[in-house]
């Protein structure tokens, strides 16, 4: 599972997920990419599940890049605990996703295979996504 090795603070405020992704919105490494068109949070488990779907479909061919990293801790209090007594412990890690963010990239495979692989990966994610190609300038 992806998570930071160490952080300055153990817990973070919830915050707001507003605006569009400007950083990480272009296809930088591979030929084809899966881009988020909706906003939300991706957990480390969801990122890993989609990565597995991608690698299993592509098999030995191609190289895959994961362009998102879960760096925000989400806390939760245990079940049947009364309110108060401070914030709960860190339960899992999430990556906040804005529309336009590139999630995964792939190269070394045909466009048809890339589309199929990204369709399988997108089914594992709670966001609306789209398939994009690298534009050559």
Swiss-Prot record:
GO terms of molecular function: rRNA binding; structural constituent of ribosome; tRNA binding
InterPro entries: Ribosomal_uL16 (IPR047873), Ribosomal_uL16_bact-type (IPR000114), Ribosomal_uL16_CS (IPR020798), Ribosomal_uL16_dom (IPR016180), Ribosomal_uL16_sf (IPR036920)
Cellular component annotations (GO), alphabetically ordered: cytosolic large ribosomal subunit
Membrane-spanning residues: none
Source superkingdom: Bacteria
Keyword annotations from UniProtKB, A to Z: Ribonucleoprotein, Ribosomal protein, RNA-binding, rRNA-binding, tRNA-binding
Pfam families attached to this UniProt entry: Ribosomal_L16
PROSITE patterns recorded: RIBOSOMAL_L16_1, RIBOSOMAL_L16_2
GO BP term, pick one: translation
Functional description taken from the UniProt entry: Binds 23S rRNA and is also seen to make contacts with the A and possibly P site tRNAs.
Subunit structure and binding partners: Part of the 50S ribosomal subunit.
HAMAP family, alphabetized: Ribosomal_uL16
Family, per entry: Belongs to the universal ribosomal protein uL16 family.
Name recorded for this polypeptide: Large ribosomal subunit protein uL16
Species for this entry: Pseudomonas paraeruginosa (strain DSM 24068 / PA7) (Pseudomonas aeruginosa (strain PA7))
């Amino acid at each position: 599972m992806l998570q930071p090795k160490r952080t300055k603070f153990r817990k973070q405020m919830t915050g707001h997920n507003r605006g569009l992704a400007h950083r990480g919105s272009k296809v930088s490494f591979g030929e084809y990419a899966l881009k988020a068109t909706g906003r939300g949070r991706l957990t480390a488990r969801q990122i890993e599940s989609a990565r597995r779907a991608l690698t299993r479909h592509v098999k030995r061919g191609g190289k895959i890049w994961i362009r998102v990293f879960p760096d925000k801790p989400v806390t939760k209090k245990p079940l049947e605990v009364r309110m108060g007594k401070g914030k709960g412990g860190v339960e899992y890690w999430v990556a906040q996703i804005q529309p336009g963010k590139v999630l995964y990239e792939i190269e070394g495979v045909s466009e048809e295979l890339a589309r199929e692989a990204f369709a399988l990966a997108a089914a594992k994610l709670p966001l609306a996504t789209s398939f994009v190609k690298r534009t050559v300038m």
